[in-house]
A protein has these predicted regions:
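Solvent-exposed N-terminal domain segments of exported/luminal and surface proteins
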Residues: 13-34, 91, 96-101, 105-106, ...
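A generic secondary-structure signal for well-formed alpha-helical elements
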Residues: 114, 118-119, 230-236, 244-252, ...
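Active-site core of glycosidic bond-cleaving carbohydrate-active enzymes
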Residues: 493-524, 603, 636, 651-666, ...
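Non-catalytic C-terminal accessory modules of carbohydrate-active enzymes
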Residues: 122-124, 130-134, 138-204, 211-214, ...
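Short, solvent-exposed loop/edge-beta patches enriched in aromatic
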Residues: 106-115, 119-121, 135-141, 145-155, ...
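Active-site acid/base region of carbohydrate-active enzymes
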Residues: 175-189, 198, 266, 270-330, ...
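Acidic/polar, glycine-enriched structural segments that form the non-catalytic walls/loops
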Residues: 12-88, 189, 194-197, 202, ...
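Aromatic-rich carbohydrate-recognition surfaces in CAZymes
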Residues: 144-149, 154-157, 166, 230, ...
Length: 867
């Protein structure tokens, strides 16, 4: 990226100023091997602004009156779901997750569950049951350091600022002014300067999240590498104790029947020792494993079981006495009802004066077979392909992690370094780009195998999708799903995935292809069961044939089998879902050159194209809005001709016509080029006003030819570059004019240009409040808008626009590793930990395209005729 823009260089230079998140750091230590770029925060930092989730009290009176019917229908449905059926709502508008400004990098790979570790070192967000979260900080889950000189313990400290009511026999209250956290996902560092001890600890946390890797990236493991630097004039014995409670901090931990046992695992001359914590609920039992690597000069000891709700003096004194644990043999007894158990592993070594040593520890979990909420089908996770599905893989997983993490780090650095070493890119962007990838693992993500006895007919559905490569793709790469958001519990929400899919197609393209095959199957199938939709109260079938679904299901039900968990609108009438499928097929082919995929998707694209044409009611090449919220902005009503929905058919025609050309179907290509040309003429005549499209008295992201700054033309600009011809849907001058208008009004005129782009802005500089969504900033949409700006040469403006969102979310509001869907200028946010901000990878694609790094499309083999 030799020329990414003068503004980016200036921004990078400006970031040499100390981060506001590090102002309370009083230590001198910088840690060992800590990355230069990323998100860094002193453990003593506190965020001054604490926002509240959007609630009923934030709804203007006019909207309350407008949506009385919705409120009554939702409340009736909510009571039935939560009080009678004893299930949780797919979107719980009455009990939003409260904001906790504590989260750091999640642990674990893709699809095997995650355990999030906070930036102060706590274990605080759990998603082992697929798609279902609990937010309990488990106080017993800690690292403790013991220092000994000349046979005497001189320092023993829990590396936590907490002062809990349990385990009061331990030494709590570490001074956070002498430690900091640094995240560059999938790695993180915690640096502790031990006051008065001349010893610095650097804990490097590594999870196996590796682009284009479909084995190790699936593993439910994380490694903690403790780098110990001894600044003393004498040797020091250092012990690190890792304690862990059996369970996830829920009531189930005390349900009884859980037990622990020590283990050793030796292979290829490498030995690992630790404790297994067997957690035995009726549904989705699992085993946790804590372990350390034994090697010359490193000893590993353990405590099999202790009471984490008591004083903890026995464990503390055991470590204090000699820097070791007693290592009893044999299993612990199963817990009684109401009893909770925990275990600990300790790694010890001698560090020479002014020297350095390393201790390696791991956390693994093995929940190989899972039920979703309905408990109808048993699903086997991806990692079981390599480690078995019997529930006994935790020792092997631990050993594999501790003997392969160095290889993982080499691959991670080879992937990240070209971006990190590019001085043209601002540091905040490097942090955002990699840290937003947390959602790939911590988005309720599930990655499962298809059953070995599964046949194509089982996957195709009753209608028979006719996808010849469906079975080979799913057999080789499994099925992948992630939530719209941790609070919006629907898998593979397609209008949102449209934005986020850049991360998948650029980093794990086979998962994107697998996901698309699953969507294609649902397109040609239907679910005729009637149900009432909450927004309008009308009754319609769950899923119509030949339209793209909203989502592939709720983890509280049975995903893939029952789709469209979204109950607010009948999305068969949404205008954007079909567009987004066709454009993704075209984009995926363009970036992967997978001609077999394109051939398989072609008839499905034909089906959704025919469904989309019915929305052009006057045959002018433009789609008319239906007078209701009929696209991804599901609470923002536009009537008649806006500029968003009309562009849908134009983009569809462009993308579909380009695919037809690739497949040699000249008749289809000509048909849709005619529709495109007709639509362009009508758009110019009816909607273009010279600076942005006609929008009455508003300048809205929705109303410019970008199409809500992300849901159409910005991605069209990125995806519609077939054969390198550039965007042929709109004149370059129109696109630049629209982008400049948006930048001036929606970015610079909102919050002083420091919070990204507001969805809607009036000409007088006041955010549009006509809808609950019009005066929100949607982070993922803003990243997409920034990508479009970069694509069109407005590099400085693109970075400025996106930077506002990053600074707001990560530095001001304390929402690291839980980027919300939306926030307003003041007071509120909506939907923490949301999928759409993965769209920041569209910025990276735009940068690579500008540098000429994006691949050129590959033509299909000679002689191929379309299906």
């Amino acid at each position: 990226w030799a020329r990414t823009g003068r503004g980016a260089v200036m921004a990078a230079a400006a970031e040499t100023v100390e981060s506001p998140l590090m102002r309370r750091y009083e230590g001198a230590a910088q840690g060992r091997g800590v990355a230069a770029d990323g998100w860094r925060v002193c453990l003593a930092h506190s965020f001054e602004e604490l926002r509240q989730p959007y609630g009923a009290g934030d709804v203007p009176l006019r909207d309350v009156l407008r949506h009385v019917g919705l409120a009554l229908r939702y409340f009736r449905w909510w009571v039935k779901k939560t009080c009678i059926e004893k299930k949780t709502a797919f979107i719980d508008l009455l009990c939003a997750v409260p904001l906790q400004q504590i989260y750091g990098c999640p642990l674990g790979g893709i699809g095997g569950g995650t355990i999030t570790r906070g930036w102060r070192g706590e274990f605080c967000r759990w998603q082992l049951n697929p798609g279902l979260y609990n937010y309990d900080t488990v106080i017993a889950n800690q690292f403790t350091v013991c220092l000994r000189c000349k046979g005497q313990t001189i320092y023993q400290q829990v590396l936590s600022m907490e002062r809990p009511s349990s385990l009061q026999g331990w030494n709590w209250g570490y001074c956070g002014h002498y430690a900091f956290y640094h995240a560059l996902y999938p790695r993180a560092w915690l640096v502790y300067e031990l006051p008065g001890q001349q010893v610095v600890l650097t804990c490097r946390q590594v999870s196996p999240v590796i682009p284009h890797d479909y084995k190790d990236s699936s593993l439910p493991v994380a490694v903690f590498i403790w780098e110990v630097e001894n600044g003393r004039d004498e040797d020091v014995e250092v012990s690190i104790m890792f304690s862990l409670q059996n369970g996830m901090g829920t009531k189930e931990d005390g349900s009884g029947g859980h037990w622990n046992e020590p283990f050793t695992f030796q292979k290829d001359g490498e030995r690992v020792a630790g404790v297994l914590l067997h957690h035995c609920p009726a549904v989705n039992p699992f085993t946790l494993a804590i372990s350390a690597r034994e090697k010359a000069g490193t000893g590993v000891t353990h405590v099999t079981a202790f009471n984490p709700t008591g004083l903890g003096r026995e464990v503390w004194q055991d470590l204090l006495q000699d820097g070791r644990l007693d290592s009893p043999a044999g299993k612990s007894r199963p817990t009684e009802k109401g009893e909770v158990t925990a275990a600990a592993v300790c790694a010890s070594c001698r560090v020479p004066a002014h020297g350095h040593k390393m201790l390696e520890m791991a956390l693994a979990w093995d929940m190989p077979c899972v039920h979703f909420g309905s408990k109808e089908k048993l699903h086997v996770r991806r990692y079981t392909r390599f480690f078995g599905s019997k529930g006994d893989a935790a020792p092997a997983l631990s050993h594999y992690a501790l003997t392969h993490y160095e290889e993982w780090e080499r691959k991670i650095e080879a992937w990240q370094n070209p971006i990190l070493e590019n001085s043209q890119l601002p540091s905040w962007y490097k942090s955002a780009l990699f840290n937003e990838l947390y959602f790939m693992t911590d988005g309720g993500t599930i990655w499962v195998e298809v059953p070995p006895d599964c046949c194509a007919e089982d996957l195709q559905g009753p209608a028979g999708a006719g996808l010849s490569h469906l079975l080979p793709v799913l057999r080789e790469y499994g099925r992948f799903a992630y939530l719209e958001g941790q609070e919006y519990r629907m898998y593979n929400t397609y209008d949102v995935h449209f934005y986020a899919s850049f991360a998948l197609i650029m980093l794990w393209p086979k998962l994107q292809i697998s996901l698309q095959y699953d969507i294609a199957v649902t397109v040609v199938n239907e679910d005729v069961q009637p149900r009432q939709y909450l927004m309008g109260g009308q009754t319609a079938q769950v899923k119509m044939k030949n339209v793209v679904p909203h989502d592939i299901g709720d983890p509280g039900d049975e995903p893939w089998q029952r789709v469209n968990a979204y109950l607010m609108h009948d999305t068969a009438d949404w205008k954007d879902l079909n567009l987004k499928f066709v454009l993704q097929v075209y984009r995926d082919y363009y970036l992967t050159h997978d001609s077999l995929y394109l051939q398989d998707m072609w008839p499905v694209c034909q089906a959704v194209m025919e469904s989309e044409l019915k929305f052009d009611t006057d045959n002018d090449g433009l789609i008319e809005n239906g007078g209701f919220a009929d696209q991804t902005y599901d609470a923002w009503v536009v009537k008649g001709h806006s500029s968003e929905c009309p562009t849908f058919l134009m983009l569809l025609s462009f993308g579909y016509g380009s695919m037809a050309e690739l497949l040699g179907d000249t008749e289809i290509r000509q048909k849709y080029m005619d529709i495109l040309n007709k639509g362009k003429e009508a758009f110019e005549r009816m909607l273009w006003n010279g600076g942005c499209s006609a929008m009455g008295n508003h300048t809205q992201l929705a109303m410019c030819p970008l199409g809500r700054s992300g849901s159409s033309l910005d991605h069209g600009a990125l995806w519609g570059m077939g054969e390198g011809r550039g965007n042929t849907v709109f004149p370059k001058s129109h696109i630049l004019s629209a982008l400049r208008t948006i930048f001036e009004k929606n970015v610079l005129s909102f919050a002083g240009g420091t919070m990204g782009a507001v969805n809607g802005m009036r000409p007088d500089g006041v955010p549009d409040t006509s809808s609950v969504q019009s005066n929100e900033v949607w982070v993922g949409v803003v990243y997409s808008l920034a990508a479009t700006m970069i694509q069109e040469g407005m590099v400085e403006e693109g970075f400025r626009t996106a930077e506002g969102c990053y600074r707001t979310v990560w530095e001001r509001l304390g929402m690291a590793f839980q980027t919300p869907e939306a926030y307003r200028e003041k007071k509120v946010y909506r939907s923490l930990a949301y999928m759409r901000p993965l769209s920041i990878w569209s910025m990276q694609l735009a940068l690579e395209r500008r540098a000429g790094q994006a691949p050129a499309p590959t033509q299909l083999p000679q002689g191929y005729t379309h299906p």
